[in-house]
């Protein structure tokens, strides 16, 4: 509860556009993935279709965010069990991703890049090539990082058979993401309920067999490989066209050059800023496969620019709910390994 900020209540007093930066601060290790989930939820409520280029940008940045988040989770997990070197290598690779994020969005951490109906701006010239170059150099380094742990006797003693979560318990407690897949349940919304064009990309969903700390580590390691695989496919077939929905005029503020020269555009800009995008009455629930698990947004609209109710399904909150049961019968020192293998973010848990 120390990171509770009342996000859901704040949403009821802000326009749909104003709430985008607050989604950054849920799983703040993967803000681009949070942005995308929220934007798609509002777009479905508004019955707004975004073009293929926008979908590709969102998938690309979401998978980059997945790698970044898993690198931090892997490094922190290693540090929890005494493997300091893993954190140093992981932070070095994450820094390379942050430089790419900064070039695209203008910010390294809390990006607020995704917009309802599109993204803030198109990709810079040459940026896609630099993303491809990162993937080429990252995979060999990832293998070196994983070698430090995968067959490490001390690491295996700390994780194999420790913190076992059965398939039945994982489902009963609502676990999602790598923690659920580590227990042998191959649920991945990118495969099972694809969104933003994920259905056109080929990738595997890694699953564990025993549901222990070691399996959860292996799942996240393989997910990074699969994210690189998805990124390469996005780059290979990156579509042309607009990076925002052409019919998003009621949501998007017009370009500044038009605002300065057209009275109609100035009025439109004023209405968007002061009253927010006009969303029709209705309700929607959308969930996306984020690095920590399934992030869901339930939004109720009574019309106008401010949501009547917004509920956030936090994967970290659900994943942590099983801790009292998972801790039964294990050593106090093993609780550290269990917590590290769960890879939770309290900002998202407390909201």
Residue ranges and their predicted role:
Residues 1-351:
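Metal/cofactor-centered catalytic core regions of large enzymes
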């Amino acid at each position: 509860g120390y990171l509770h900020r009342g996000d859901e209540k704040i949403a009821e007093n802000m326009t749909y556009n104003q709430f985008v930066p607050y989604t950054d601060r849920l799983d703040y290790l993967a803000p681009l993935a949070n942005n995308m989930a929220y934007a798609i939820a509002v777009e479905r409520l508004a019955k707004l279709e975004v073009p293929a280029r926008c979908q590709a940008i969102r998938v690309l940045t979401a998978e980059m965010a997945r790698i970044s988040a898993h690198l931090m989770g892997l490094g922190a997990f290693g540090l929890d069990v005494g493997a300091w070197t893993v954190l140093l290598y992981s932070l070095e690779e994450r820094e390379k991703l942050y430089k790419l994020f900064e070039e695209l969005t203008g910010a390294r951490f809390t990006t607020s890049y995704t917009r309802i109906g599109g993204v803030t701006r198109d990709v810079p010239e040459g940026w896609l090539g630099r993303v491809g170059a990162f993937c080429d150099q990252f995979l060999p380094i990832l293998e070196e990082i994983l070698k430090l742990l995968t067959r490490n006797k001390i690491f295996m003693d700390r994780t194999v058979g420790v913190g076992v979560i059965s398939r039945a318990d994982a489902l009963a407690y609502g676990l999602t993401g790598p923690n659920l897949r580590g227990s042998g349940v191959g649920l991945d919304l990118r495969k099972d309920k694809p969104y933003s064009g994920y259905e056109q990309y080929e990738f595997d969903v890694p699953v564990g067999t025993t549901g222990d700390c070691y399996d959860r580590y292996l799942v996240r390691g393989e997910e990074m490989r699969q994210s690189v695989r998805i990124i390469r496919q996005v780059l290979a077939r990156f579509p042309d066209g607009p990076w925002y929905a052409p019919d998003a005029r009621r949501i998007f503020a017009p370009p500044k050059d038009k605002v300065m020269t057209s009275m109609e555009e100035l009025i439109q800009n004023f209405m968007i800023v002061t009253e927010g995008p006009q969303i029709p009455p209705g309700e929607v629930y959308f969930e996306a496969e984020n690095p920590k698990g399934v992030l869901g947004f339930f939004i109720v609209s009574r019309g106008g620019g401010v949501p009547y109710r917004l509920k956030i399904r936090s994967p970290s909150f659900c994943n942590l709910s099983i801790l009292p049961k998972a801790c039964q019968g294990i050593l106090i020192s093993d609780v550290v390994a269990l917590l590290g293998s769960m890879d939770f973010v309290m900002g998202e848990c407390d909201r």
